[in-house]
């Protein structure tokens, strides 16, 4: 009997589940939304069901069936009159204006604060200006006994009942509030003190497929760069030192990811680029230490003494170069926008972590092994790197007139190109809209430019500026840019621009979507669609332009002051700042000369400004290392011939310069080739910066410091001139 009853119960439960499933399928809204509530509240739902309900109430069918003046919005906070947690209210609001906007907006509120009423309950008091007070009196008089909703960002913060006409502009909002809720509501109301209603001045929409592809490309470039760096370190510094450097790289990655996870930071492509570049920074520290250890071993010291001296002598160069890069990273973080801040965050974390892993972590391992008489005969070179650039006596200082002449001619050419060809400015600096459109079949950008040439016409009858460039190598992805009606505040302009784009491409048989809604949907790829879009208003474009100029100037000034403080000589500050300015000019100049001639975009945007600042931060590394060696030799030989001393210092650091530049170029080439189109322009600027930044350290920064410092002093005795060149 028991078994029969158990089977009957199970069958009944299965039947009940089937009935529930059928009911949910037949009435999906009623199964998730509990009706009732009174006043503006039409129902309650769990937070986990809101997404499913939104698909129903915001669907095309709902738009046709529901009244046109009805708006359904969720509450900002969970309801407090239900027993379950995370239950939100659904409010039904009536649109009372022809424009669809609220009859009263936040600009009429002059003050709002959280207080307590006579019963000691938390309330919010607000005060309006004269015009707001007049309209508020009219609204409250016409809606006694009804609710008036306070809405921000599409959610209802409060919907209090109107008990009577309120004049004078002073009102009190009461309800079942907590102190935290009244503080939040007061701050929300005070945010309405802006001089004009808020409108979208900058927007970026990325389709999920495009975003996934970008992240995948970033991860691939990161993994490939990491593996190549590991191979390079072993190839240049042998098994044990190479693997120790690789261990430091691995710990660097884990620490960086751990810190990002603790901050709950989202993984973005610029953030991945920052991580990849931080690998180059980590390698630089290890290269400095290993080159110093090799010098100490060549001087006849034992392994223990050589390792201790190598770490000790390399510390100042590592500290100064990392700190100058950190200064640039902080400037990027404080002055940049979303993508640049993401890059700066991971780069800053990488700089700090690489300093810890290179200077302290690997030192602990070496000390432990050497104290136990292990690794006493460890080799820090291989057949490839043995005596690399050792004993060279290049006379760099005697070439400064020639190199300065070449630099001046190049600067004139770059500046001339600015006036003749200009720069390919993105909407970040001009204002406008970008649409990345994926077509079914390959299409030429020139064809798109022809099709859209007369499509976008501004309200005054003038033609909007329109452009198109290819994205990727398949020929199916085109980025369309236009400044159509960018000055307009109308909320319908965005839809108008997308409709114009769709109609023009549809007429030319370039897309086959049956509606503009399908064309705008990034998930509907068949027939062609917009997979991402960006909008920048003219005010934001002006702010970005000025912010870019200020950030670069501020970076140069900050580095000038830091070098002055650390090296206590204006000659090094002048040399480094002039060279850094030339590095920035060179990168910008090549972008002016090459845009339109290379098969990838060279637009000047916020990412490019981030690249310029990164070039400044990276380039100063090499200059600091060279200057640190010059400073060291000046202390050892204060009366030595300075031309010979400068030449010797540069020659002594050539091996480090070559290894660091090569390892960084490996990383950047991985980003450039594998990182995707969205980061290619950034990596190209960095490649130019590394190449010309390295050259400027030798041929501009050092000679400039040499000239300012003074060339002729009394030569020291021959026995003290060990570092001098033999003429």
Regions found by a protein language model. Give the residues of each.
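Hydrophobic alpha-helical transmembrane segments of membrane transport and translocation systems
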Residues: 258-259, 295-316, 320-407, 647, ...
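Juxtamembrane "pre-transmembrane" interface segments
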Residues: 169-172, 180-227, 500, 504, ...
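Transmembrane helices with small-residue packing motifs
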Residues: 389-441
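Small-residue-enriched core segments of transmembrane alpha-helices in multipass membrane transport
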Residues: 242-264, 275-282, 343-358, 573-595, ...
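Pore- and gate-forming transmembrane helices of large, multi-pass membrane proteins
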Residues: 209-229, 281, 301-337, 395-397, ...
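Non-transmembrane, solvent-exposed regions of membrane trafficking/translocation machinery
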Residues: 1-161, 542, 546-547, 563
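Cytosolic juxtamembrane regions of multi-pass inner-membrane proteins
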Residues: 280-321, 367-375, 592, 598-660, ...
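Interfacial segments of transmembrane alpha-helices in multi-pass membrane proteins
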Residues: 124-125, 129-144, 148-149, 212-267, ...
């Amino acid at each position: 009997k028991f078994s029969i009853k158990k089977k009957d119960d199970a069958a009944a439960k299965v039947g009940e589940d089937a009935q529930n499933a059928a009911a949910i399928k037949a009435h999906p809204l009623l199964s998730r939304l509990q009706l009732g509530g009174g006043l503006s509240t039409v129902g309650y739902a769990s937070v986990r069901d809101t997404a499913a309900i939104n698909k129903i109430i915001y669907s095309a069918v709902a738009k046709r069936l529901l009244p046109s003046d009805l708006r359904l919005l969720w509450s900002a906070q969970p309801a407090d009159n239900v027993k379950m947690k995370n239950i939100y209210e659904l409010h039904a609001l009536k649109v009372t204006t022809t424009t669809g906007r609220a009859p009263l907006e936040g600009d009429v509120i002059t003050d709002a604060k959280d207080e307590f009423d006579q019963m000691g309950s938390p309330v919010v008091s607000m005060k309006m200006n004269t015009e707001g007070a007049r309209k508020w009196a009219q609204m409250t008089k016409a809606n006694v006994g009804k609710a008036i909703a306070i809405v921000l960002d599409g959610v209802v913060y409060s919907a209090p009942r109107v008990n009577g006409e309120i004049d004078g502009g002073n009102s009190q909002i009461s309800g079942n509030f907590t102190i935290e809720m009244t503080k939040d509501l007061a701050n929300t109301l005070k945010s309405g003190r802006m001089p004009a209603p808020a409108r979208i001045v900058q927007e970026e929409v990325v389709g999920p497929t495009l975003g996934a592809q970008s992240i995948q490309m970033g991860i691939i470039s990161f993994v490939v760069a990491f593996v190549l760096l590991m191979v390079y370190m072993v190839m240049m510094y042998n098994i044990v030192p190479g693997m120790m450097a690789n261990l430091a790289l691995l710990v660097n990655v884990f620490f960086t990811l751990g810190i990002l996870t603790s901050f709950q930071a989202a993984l973005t492509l610029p953030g991945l680029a920052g991580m990849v570049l931080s690998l180059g920074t980590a390698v630089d520290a290890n290269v400095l230490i290993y080159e110093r250890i090799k010098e100490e071993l060549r001087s006849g010291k034992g392994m223990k003494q050589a390792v201790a001296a190598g770490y000790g002598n390399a510390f100042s160069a590592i500290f100064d170069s990392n700190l100058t890069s950190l200064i640039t990273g902080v400037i990027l973080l404080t002055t940049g926008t979303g993508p640049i801040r993401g890059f700066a965050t991971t780069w800053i974390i990488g700089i700090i972590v690489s300093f810890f892993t290179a200077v302290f972590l690997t030192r602990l391992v070496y000390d432990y092994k050497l104290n136990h008489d292990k690794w006493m005969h460890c080799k820090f070179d291989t057949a490839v790197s043995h005596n690399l650039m050792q004993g060279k006596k290049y006379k760099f200082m005697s070439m400064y007139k020639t190199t300065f002449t070449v630099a001046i001619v190049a600067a004139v050419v770059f500046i001339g190109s600015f006036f003749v060809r200009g720069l390919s400015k993105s909407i970040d600096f001009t204002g406008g809209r970008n649409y990345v459109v994926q077509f079914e079949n390959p299409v030429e950008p020139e064809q798109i430019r022809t099709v859209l040439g007369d499509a976008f016409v501004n309200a005054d009858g003038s033609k909007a500026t329109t452009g198109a460039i290819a994205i990727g190598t398949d020929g199916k992805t085109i980025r369309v840019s236009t400044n159509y009606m960018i000055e307009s505040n109308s909320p319908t302009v965005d839809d108008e621009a997308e409709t114009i784009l769709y109609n023009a491409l549809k007429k030319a048989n370039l897309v086959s979507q049956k509606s503009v809604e399908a064309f705008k949907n990034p998930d509907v790829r068949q027939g062609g669609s917009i997979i991402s879009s960006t909008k920048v208003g003219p005010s934001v474009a002006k702010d970005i332009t000025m912010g870019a100029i200020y950030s670069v100037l501020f970076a140069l000034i900050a580095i000038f002051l830091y070098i002055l403080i650390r090296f206590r000589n204006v000659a090094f500050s002048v040399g480094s700042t002039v060279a850094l300015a030339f590095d920035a000019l060179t990168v910008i100049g090549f972008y002016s000369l090459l845009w339109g001639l290379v098969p990838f975009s060279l637009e000047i945007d916020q990412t490019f400004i981030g690249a310029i600042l990164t070039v400044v931060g990276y380039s100063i590394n090499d200059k600091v290392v060279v200057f640190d060696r010059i400073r060291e030799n000046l202390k050892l030989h204060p009366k030595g011939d300075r031309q010979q001393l400068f030449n010797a210092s540069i020659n002594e650091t050539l091996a480090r310069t070559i290894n660091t530049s090569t390892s960084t170029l490996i990383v950047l080439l991985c980003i450039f080739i594998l990182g995707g189109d969205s980061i290619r322009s950034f990596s190209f600027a960095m490649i130019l910066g590394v190449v010309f930044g390295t050259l400027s350290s030798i041929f501009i920064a050092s000679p400039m410091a040499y000239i300012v410092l003074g060339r002729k002093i009394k030569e020291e005795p021959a026995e003290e001139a060990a570092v001098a060149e033999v003429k």
